[in-house]
Regions:
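N-terminal secretory signal peptides
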Residues: 1-15, 22-33
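Early extracytoplasmic/lumenal segment of secretory-pathway proteins
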Residues: 46-115
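Periplasmic-binding protein-like
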Residues: 153, 217-225, 263-287
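Mature extracytoplasmic/periplasmic domains
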Residues: 277, 286-346
Length: 369
């Protein structure tokens, strides 16, 4: 992949993953039918009539290459994917409120799904209709009770191995060493308030999910104190700068690293000792749908090993069904940033309206400093 193609891929993925907290964009309309294979596991869900269209709120191309065609062949239902809205969680609530009954199911991060549930926009999820959900560890299903969790993302460090023989292995070390000759002016952070302030909280030893206003202010000040040594807060292109040596270390996303790692042996991944802030994304059934039985069939179909592996290979996301690892492409299966077993300290961030407002104010202060 060329450098500019890598940067473009990172930008679109970066925006998508913030479904879980603030933003999302882009989509395509897809209605396909084609060839596929049958499965006893898929037929386990009952009650769906054959034929019709399921309408999904989804990010562009966030689907296995063959999933839609194979499901259409087996069940007669096509999947129409409509665009996720700009404007954050409020836009999601407004879109689904004004179009109740139009959509059958949606992609949503754990924080977005929680807000949809609070606004009575989700159908009650019946896990008994998705037998393949048993393949997903309870760690994930308990964090995402609104539907089926599909994948996860996490934030760690990636660094240039040539420049740093002993890189920081924690947020505390990163902040403490920011002014050193090895790191000063060569540190990259995401241009996103939550990720930056989470880093500050972790560096201070705080729990990002129970932070008080005073702790958020401390985190703000900690970030401001190292800002002179930060090269940039950027949306995309961090791995390219790590590889070419213009930056030494970045706080960044596992999927960015997964794209970049096959391109260079000079880039390495670190799961910080405090843990990796993460998020779950999944599919949720929507209130007002007249096709919930078919929705459950598609949920179950998605979690079959071959279909789920197709999804992970296409999206290069971190998987949550351990058994599919042997079916994944080598660049995905062997990526230490994506492998859940190599990142056991991942935890999932929770946001509410008050915390979101506090983060926004703190981020503005960081930008103004």
């Amino acid at each position: 992949m060329k450098t500019n193609e890598l940067a473009n891929a990172q930008l679109t993925r970066r925006t998508f993953f913030k479904l879980s907290a603030v933003t999302a964009f882009g989509a395509t309309i897809v209605g396909l039918a084609g060839c596929g294979s049958s499965s006893a596991a898929s037929s386990a869900t009952a009650g769906s009539s054959s034929g019709g269209t399921l309408t999904m709120l989804n990010y562009a191309d966030w689907m296995g290459v063959d999933e839609v065609e194979n499901f259409a062949k087996q069940y007669g239902f096509t999947i129409e994917e409509l665009p996720t809205p700009d404007g954050g969680t409020t836009a999601w609530v407004n879109t689904l409120t004004s179009n109740k009954g139009t959509y059958d199911f949606a992609l949503a991060g754990n924080n977005v799904a929680k807000r949809l549930k609070e606004n009575n926009l989700l159908a009650d999820f019946d896990a008994s209709k998705v037998p393949n959900l048993s393949k997903v560890a309870s760690t994930y299903t308990s964090e995402f009770p609104y539907g089926i969790p599909c994948e996860q993302g996490k934030i760690g460090f990636y660094y240039n191995k040539r420049l740093l023989s002993t890189p920081p292995t924690s947020y505390k070390e990163l902040f403490a060493q920011a002014s050193s000759d090895a790191l000063a002016g060569k540190i990259l952070f995401p241009a996103y308030d939550g990720d930056v302030l989470d880093a500050g909280l972790l560096a201070l030893g705080y729990d990002v999910n129970s932070a008080t206003a005073a702790q958020i202010e401390e985190a703000r000040d900690a970030v401001i104190s190292i800002k002179p040594y930060v090269k940039a807060f950027i949306d995309s292109g961090a791995p390219s700068q790590i590889i070419d040596g213009s930056a030494a270390i970045a706080v960044g996303y596992d999927y960015d690293y997964a794209y970049a790692a096959p391109e260079s042996e000079d880039i390495g991944w670190i799961a910080p000792s405090e843990g990796c802030p993460g998020y779950l994304d999944g599919w949720v059934p929507l209130a007002g749908s007249k096709n919930l039985d078919a929705v459950y069939q598609f949920f179950n179909f998605h979690l079959e090993d071959e279909n789920y592996a197709d999804f992970i290979n296409t999206t290069m996301a971190s998987w949550i069904i351990p058994e599919v690892k042997s079916l994944l492409d080598p660049d995905v299966a062997n990526c230490e940033a994506l492998d859940p077993e190599k990142n056991p300290g991942t935890f999932y961030t929770q946001n509410d309206a008050d915390k979101t407002a506090q983060y926004a104010a703190a981020w503005q202060a960081i930008q103004n400093a």
